[in-house]
Amino acid sequence: MAKVYYNGDANEQYLQGKTVAIIGYGSQGHAHAQNLRDSGVHVIIGLRKGRSWEQAEQDGFDVYSVREASKKADIVMVLLPDEKQPAVYKEEIEPELKPGNALVFAHGFNIHFSQIVPPEHVDVFLVAPKGPGHLVRRTYVEGAGVPALIAVYQDVTGHAKETALAYAKAIGAARAGVLETTFKEETETDLFGEQAVLCGGLTALIKAGFETLVEAGYQPEVAYFECLHEMKLIVDLLYEGGLSWMRYSISDTAQWGDFTSGPRVINEAVKAEMKNILHDIQTGKFAKGWILENQANRPEFNAINQRENEHLIEVVGRELRSMMPFVKAKQKEVVVPGAKN
């Protein structure tokens, strides 16, 4: 079982007198920066000019170019999108890294797949909250926290792990629990979860169910409710208490259908394909394809994205959500050219 660390296992002294540069001020960036500051850590922000720069200044931070922030910092936390990190790192961060500095990530993709090769004279570790930035911030303010993973890739100072734990504590994660992992494990399991279950698997399952009902002559609106809209009700139960709590909370008819029909949908053939997906991740095949896609300016990505946004389930969903202000108020609709939004 994984080793779990809490507040009492972390020592803030490893951040005392240090300057932390948060590179990026998006979902995770703003949460890390504000939580660290509220924990007494000296934080600066590294950005390129734009709206995020203005927002960070409005939030009371000193904002610099990425290169200048990296030069001023003892700890550099890179919170940019994976595909943007290598170029920014090479051009603006790497030249300013000094012996004994710490280079930190919230996802191991670029280190694990050698898109970023750090110098030998810096600590390299990972602090990955298991929740979106707004939740990391909100729970911190409420006196709680979001669990996180930590991993050490390179320990030059002899206390990279201690610094990682101190950082995790300062963003509130050690209030909930910090699990130790490796860059390899975090990267491969995160990608697998996204592809096979949370994103790829789930969206494919929802669409297949929706299409099955529509092709059988049922109204698309009813199919949408049954296969997509009600998903939140089930996911909330799973989130609160796992599979057993969800099954306890639904009707016996639904539970019997779960037991008898679920394995017909997710069968051994599906599991075998999951193993193939995992193999593609482990061997670097997926990473290579994604890197090449970005280098080519994402032609396939953009084409698929456009096609998916025009699927009937999205057309119907936009219409139905317009009838539900309690949903619409919380959502950000994807703007699809030619579609009603």
From Swiss-Prot:
One cellular component (GO) term of this entry: cytosol
Residues reported in the UniProt entry to bind Mg(2+) 2: 190, 226, 230
EC number(s) given by UniProt: 1.1.1.86
Keywords for the protein's UniProt record, in alphabetical order: Amino-acid biosynthesis, Branched-chain amino acid biosynthesis, Magnesium, Metal-binding, NADP, Oxidoreductase
PROSITE patterns, alphabetized: KARI_C, KARI_N
Cofactor: Mg(2+)
Pathway membership, UniProt: Amino-acid biosynthesis; L-isoleucine biosynthesis; L-isoleucine from 2-oxobutanoate: step 2/4; Amino-acid biosynthesis; L-valine biosynthesis; L-valine from pyruvate: step 2/4
Amino acids binding substrate: 251
Binding, NADP(+): 25-28, 48, 52, 82-85, 133
Domain KARI N-terminal Rossmann: start-end pairs: 2-181
GO molecular function: ketol-acid reductoisomerase activity; magnesium ion binding; NADP binding
Cofactor notes: Binds 2 magnesium ions per subunit.
Catalytic residues of the enzyme: 107
Binding-site list for Mg(2+) 1: 190, 194
Domain of life according to the entry: Bacteria
Domain KARI C-terminal knotted: residue ranges: 182-327
Entry's Gene Ontology BP terms: isoleucine biosynthetic process; L-valine biosynthetic process
Pfam families per the UniProt record, alphabetical: KARI_C (PF01450), KARI_N (PF07991)
Known function: Involved in the biosynthesis of branched-chain amino acids (BCAA). Catalyzes an alkyl-migration followed by a ketol-acid reduction of (S)-2-acetolactate (S2AL) to yield (R)-2,3-dihydroxy-isovalerate. In the isomerase reaction, S2AL is rearranged via a Mg-dependent methyl migration to produce 3-hydroxy-3-methyl-2-ketobutyrate (HMKB). In the reductase reaction, this 2-ketoacid undergoes a metal-dependent reduction by NADPH to yield (R)-2,3-dihydroxy-isovalerate.
Protein family membership: Belongs to the ketol-acid reductoisomerase family.
Protein name: Ketol-acid reductoisomerase (NADP(+))
Taxonomic lineage from the root: Bacteria, Bacillati, Bacillota, Bacilli, Bacillales
Gene: ilvC
